[in-house]
């Protein structure tokens, strides 16, 4: 993958990710799960920018298709092209306000597959992310406003402990 052509985004917005219609092949599922687990570690530890793509693919671990493998390879190509990105923290002595943390939350309303919204939030301190989360909401929100409130509630619970 060192000489792979880099891409600008981990997921192609024009491709719809769908379940595999072909029965499961155990060897394929095992290698897919291994690579996906390694990418989940990277997403959780240092690269929150791939969290959505990795979480989306995790839903197909039991029966991955060649398309799902192709998307995993695309994420690797994205990582290869963005090696310079990472989390950095900076000390701001002159302006104490810069050392405070900031939080951002958002929601994506009603996934086409199961109508559940997705919550995402990130908290930043000294210029770097200190905690973040991306997860499917457990309820089916009836409006975008409701899904945003759920996202803010999740972020608020996390902020309470920071």
Segments predicted by a language model, with ranges:
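Long, low-complexity, charge-biased intrinsically disordered regions
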Residues: 1-162
């Amino acid at each position: 993958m060192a000489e792979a052509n880099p891409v600008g985004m981990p997921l192609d917005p024009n491709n719809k990710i769908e379940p595999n219609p072909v029965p499961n092949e155990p060897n394929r599922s095992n290698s897919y799960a291994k690579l996906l687990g390694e990418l989940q570690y990277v997403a959780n530890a240092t690269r929150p920018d791939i969290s959505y793509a990795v979480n989306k693919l995790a839903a197909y671990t039991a029966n991955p298709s060649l398309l799902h493998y192709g998307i995993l390879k695309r994420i690797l190509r994205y990582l290869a092209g963005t090696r310079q990105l990472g989390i950095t923290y900076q000390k701001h002595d002159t302006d104490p306000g810069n050392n405070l943390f900031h939080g951002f939350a958002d929601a994506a309303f009603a996934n086409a597959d199961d109508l559940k919204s997705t919550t995402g939030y990130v908290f930043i301190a000294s210029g770097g992310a200190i905690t973040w989360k991306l997860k499917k909401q457990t309820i089916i929100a009836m409006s975008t406003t409701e899904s945003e409130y759920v996202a803010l509630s999740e972020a608020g619970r996390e902020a309470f402990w920071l």
